[in-house]
């Protein structure tokens, strides 16, 4: 437990803890029906018809990142978060990683709202794809050889996983693509440790505006 919730990586530890607690609560309150649509909805999964009917439920765009559909879904995503989250905190810093994770997840869920309007969807994958994409961007922007190599490695993983999202049933391609787009934009917005001048202020401003505009457009389309 001490190794998992490491104080050197407070944000990764926080997200692991919250997601684990949600998963345990789902099982304790619903038993082996914890993957039912009713339970997923109760704990905050994205369900576009509900958000459209009750716009005040846009909080689901954030909460769905902490809800998982089954043990395998939970374990795979938490293992990915455990390893990738630590790298993200080292590269971007804890504060920046906090926002990249949450906002990438939100962007992925906005894509679900628009492009999967009848599906009930949940999982940290939207945020994880954003993390992958944010490191891939550094492949082309950073002068650090380590970050360039890491970005190249994650580019291959990102492509493979996106292809898998297309071929495998029950996978939210919209959420994964949206999360990746969000993460790529946020990698420009938030500075990298030791390379704060990697982008000019104007470039950061354009990326910020693009993220906000895309989010607002998707929300408008999804609600109306």
Where are these regions (language model features)?
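C-terminal transmembrane module of polytopic alpha-helical membrane proteins
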Residues: 1-11, 162-224
